[in-house]
Amino acid sequence: MAAVQVRRRGRALALALWAGFALSVGGGVRARDGLATPPAFEGQAAPAVSWPCPPPADRLDDLALLEAIDLALCHSPALRQGWARIKARSAEVGLARAPYYPSVALSAGRSAQRRSTGLGEDGVRNNVMAVTLAWRLFDSGARSAALRAAQAQLDEAAQAYGAVLQDKLAEVVGAYYEAATARQALHTAVEDTEIARRSASIAARRARAGLDSHGDVLHAQAALERARLAQAQAEGAQARALAGLAQVLGVDPATPIVLAPGPLAPQRIEDRELAQWLRDARQRHPAIKAAQAGLAAATAQVDVARATDMPTVDLSLGHYRNSSENVSVFAGSSRSVSASLNLRIPLFDGFARRHRIQGARAEVQRQEALLDQARLATGAAVARAYADLRAARASHEASLRWLKAARAAYESDLRRYEAGVGGVAELLRAQSDWLSARQRHVLYAAQLRTRALALLAAAGELGRSTIDGDPPKE
């Protein structure tokens, strides 16, 4: 009869346990699942440390911009560090969720005792087995506050990862644009050398015909050598730009890199007023979102400090079995089931709780200052990038007008010179002006792309859909 009552009590306790467990898991505070993959880069997950990168290539031919981005992200140590931090924060969310569940432990033991007397020897063997369960039912909100703090820290890590991703994208695209601009500048320098060679050839031919002096030929030859010097400098600039691109991509500096053929397309960007850019940046920039998540985590830590050393209620269940046997005679066994409900009310802790709350509030103030700093820095960066983009647009338009006028003037003076009307000095001045206009136009076209990129990066809007630059497909 007693055994039946024990089993009934055990079933009743089990039912109460599972009912409370369902209420706790179903109605209590629950953390969202930890991130299983890194934050997506507009449909394509960013590479993580566990993802294998492609094997090193002997050379990179026809390297397009988006291919360069993928390669650089795969080899980026900063992104691998950020992703590892996300995984660590995700594990902390799981740790913060763990106190909502009961803990179950199984223990077993065996002991032997032998005794010798004048009447002989006897021995006793004891076998002990126990299953215990401990479950915190009430903790004055400490678990929920800790869970909110862990979730906010995970959000902060994800947003910080996004900020690092923005910086890396800007670095890669900037290096690619620099290499493409250097290639275009070299192409222009080669054409300029051919133009100067043509003028020198015409001057030599006219000198042989007695139409120009030897001094005119020397002036034309000097202009040709100046063009050759500019071509040599452009070749060196291209080599330096490709070396910088290799470093950003994370490949061997000796790897030959050939960019995809064709000119870079202009970087498209929405035409918005500065006030709109600032509003959008405050809402979207990952650095601001990371600071906001850090503030949320600090605020949750204040709740954790308040709930620490507050009243708690714990449920304990235990099922024990003890059996013993004599060396010659079986002694018997016993079973027992225990249940306890414990209330703990801290009375005095040496003012530790008050100091914890003060420290948590100070951290909130620090996070508020960091958030203000992030907003100010983002706003200043957006304002500077916006002004730079406006200036770059004006410079690009002016360089285009200069290029058209200088080319028309050169072609006019060339026709006059070939017709024997103009002199070589006029032709060389027009040629120098046109070549300068060509070089400036290449520079300002590149500057317009980089300034548009800088504005997108400052506003936190850099991504696949906003990055142009690959050559148009035929």
From Swiss-Prot:
Membrane topology of the entry: Peripheral membrane protein
- GO BP annotations, alphabetical order: killing of cells of another organism
Q: Which UniProt keywords apply?
A: Cell outer membrane, Cytolysis, Hemolysis, Membrane, Signal, Transmembrane, Transmembrane beta strand, Transport
SUPFAM superfamilies, sorted: Outer membrane efflux proteins (OEP) (SSF56954)
Q: Which residues does UniProt assign to the signal peptide? A: 1-31
Question: What PANTHER family does UniProt report for this protein, alphabetically?
Answer: OUTER MEMBRANE PROTEIN TOLC
Q: What is this protein called?
A: Protein CyaE
